[in-house]
Amino acid sequence: MKKTVLSGVQATGSLHLGNYLGSIRNWVKMQEEYNCFFFLADLHSITVDIAPSELKRSVIETLAIYLAAGLDPNKVTIFAQSMVKEHAELAWLLNCVTPLGWLKRMTQFKDKAGKDQEKACLGLFSYPVLMAADILIYKADIVPVGEDQKQHLELTRDIAGVINRKFNKEILKVPEVLIGGSGTRIMSLRDGSKKMSKSDSSDFSRINLRDDNDLIHQKIKKAKTDHLSFVSYDKEARPEISNLLDIYTTLSEEKLENIIQNYEGFAKFKEDLAEIIITNLQPMRDKYLELMNDQEYLLKILHQGAEKARVRASETVNELKEQFGFVI
């Protein structure tokens, strides 16, 4: 029997090269080998202020990107998180066994809430519990994540352990965390110490998957390097050029040493890197535009995926509710 893989991307903003190399491209490979559930995390999206029209648009656009990148709805289950109400139901059950102290240690809440944490919503604080519900509800064997989500996955494992000990049986599967290799952590084009992010105020900090060719050339040309005039790889001393080299090697699948030897300076290196990015993204962008012209098809995929996901999700929730003593 195939192992189950679960992952998702928050449905806000425009997906970028970091999302593609860190998550989506790997999902496309995994769909051949695993029983995959890939979702649009729209419940997570409302933990910050977002206009209703933007949320709806983001869900549809993200789905179109998933499909354009190569995810096959006949091979994987793709759905919007909010369409499977059991996610929220399980999150509440898990909230009731998760110690407050565990959530206070979550570093992402501190980062996202900023200095005035008193004004942050409860949903943002309990975000990791909903994330745990997203994973545990499908009894996932493997959860591929970036390094920045490792703390949340450890919390998920801890929560599963609490439930299993409470009822003295393995109700929830403790998942294996899969931290990706090359290309999983693409950094900002403006600051090599920060991860590429759709929430960054500067659009030139990232390559959006829908950027046209001219804009990609502009962004790579203006990407920060340093005062040195040669190409070399050193994550600590030269984070910006090292990040560009990571992108180059991941997309071209060439050896790092060969790439470094081919370039004396930044100009030709950046020009070639932009072309490599365009070669990889243009077919996806063309397919995306085609899919966006068929909204009826996209909605059909979401509803079919949700219906399929709900079968698995309801089994887990009902099993746990029975253990708690609810009448079902």
UniProtKB/Swiss-Prot annotation:
One of its GO terms (cellular component) is cytoplasm. One of its GO terms (biological process) is tryptophanyl-tRNA aminoacylation. L-tryptophan binds at D134. The keyword ATP-binding applies. It is found in: Cytoplasm. It comes from the Bacteria. Signal peptide: none annotated. Keywords: Aminoacyl-tRNA synthetase, ATP-binding, Cytoplasm, Ligase, Nucleotide-binding, Protein biosynthesis. A motif ('HIGH' region) lies at residues 11-19. It catalyses: tRNA(Trp) + L-tryptophan + ATP = L-tryptophyl-tRNA(Trp) + AMP + diphosphate + H(+). InterPro entries: aa-tRNA-synth_Ic (IPR002305), Rossmann-like_a/b/a_fold (IPR014729), Trp-tRNA-ligase (IPR002306), Trp-tRNA-ligase_bac-type (IPR024109), Trp-tRNA_synthetase (IPR050203). The keyword ATP-binding applies. Pfam families: tRNA-synt_1b. GO terms for molecular function: ATP binding; tryptophan-tRNA ligase activity. ATP binds at Q10, A11, T12, G18, N19, G146, E147, D148, I186, K195, M196, S197, K198, S199. Its EC number is 6.1.1.2. A motif ('KMSKS' region) lies at residues 195-199. Homodimer. Belongs to the class-I aminoacyl-tRNA synthetase family. Catalyzes the attachment of tryptophan to tRNA(Trp). This is Tryptophan--tRNA ligase. The lineage of its organism: Bacteria, Pseudomonadati, Pseudomonadota, Alphaproteobacteria, Rickettsiales. The gene is trpS.
